[in-house]
Each structure stands twice: as structure tokens, then as C-alpha cells.
Amino acid sequence: MHDIAGVTNETGNVLGMMPHPERAVEALLGGTDGLGVFQSLINQTEGADVRGAR
């Protein structure tokens, strides 16, 4: 319906998605288009205080 591939909550800190970016992170396997998803996760969590996080 409407070609929706993913959804987030209002604050953007919860993501649900149908594509599999982990399958597109190695050029040897056909492409690196999925790297952006994982790089953004790294960028957002670097320096974050995760003590006590569960």
C-alpha cells in the first residue's frame, strides 16, 4: 500500500523497515547501498551515554 518500506515513531528513535540493508553492505556481494543505514546508527550512538540502558 503506497510503497511504504519503513515507518518511525514521532521522535524518530524507533524504526521498522522491510528492506534488508544488511544484504547490501559489501561491494563484493553486489552493492553498498545499505551502508548508510549502519553508518547513521554508528554516528548517532558515538559518544552516547548508554550506562543503564537495556
UniProtKB/Swiss-Prot annotation:
GO BP term (any one): 'de novo' IMP biosynthetic process
UniProt-annotated location(s): Cytoplasm
Keyword Zinc in annotation: no
Ranges of residues in domain Glutamine amidotransferase type-1: 1-51
Assigned keywords, A-Z: ATP-binding, Cytoplasm, Glutamine amidotransferase, Hydrolase, Ligase, Nucleotide-binding, Purine biosynthesis
E.C. code: 6.3.5.3, 3.5.1.2
SUPFAM superfamilies: Class I glutamine amidotransferase-like (SSF52317)
Catalysed conversion reaction: N(2)-formyl-N(1)-(5-phospho-beta-D-ribosyl)glycinamide + L-glutamine + ATP + H2O = 2-formamido-N(1)-(5-O-phospho-beta-D-ribosyl)acetamidine + L-glutamate + ADP + phosphate + H(+); L-glutamine + H2O = L-glutamate + NH4(+)
GO cellular component: cytoplasm
InterPro entries named in the record: Class_I_gatase-like (IPR029062), PRibForGlyAmidine_synth_PurQ (IPR010075)
Domain of life from the UniProt record: Bacteria
One term of GO molecular function: ATP binding
Entries under Pfam families matching the protein: GATase_5
Active-site residue numbers: 20, 22
Involved pathway(s): Purine metabolism; IMP biosynthesis via de novo pathway; 5-amino-1-(5-phospho-D-ribosyl)imidazole from N(2)-formyl-N(1)-(5-phospho-D-ribosyl)glycinamide: step 1/2
Quaternary structure and interacting proteins, as annotated: Part of the FGAM synthase complex composed of 1 PurL, 1 PurQ and 2 PurS subunits.
Record-linked PANTHER family: PHOSPHORIBOSYLFORMYLGLYCINAMIDINE SYNTHASE SUBUNIT PURQ (PTHR47552:SF1)
Free-text function comment from the UniProt entry: Part of the phosphoribosylformylglycinamidine synthase complex involved in the purines biosynthetic pathway. Catalyzes the ATP-dependent conversion of formylglycinamide ribonucleotide (FGAR) and glutamine to yield formylglycinamidine ribonucleotide (FGAM) and glutamate. The FGAM synthase complex is composed of three subunits. PurQ produces an ammonia molecule by converting glutamine to glutamate. PurL transfers the ammonia molecule to FGAR to form FGAM in an ATP-dependent manner.
Protein name in the entry: Phosphoribosylformylglycinamidine synthase subunit PurQ
Species whose genome carries this gene: Lacticaseibacillus casei
Gene name of the record: purQ
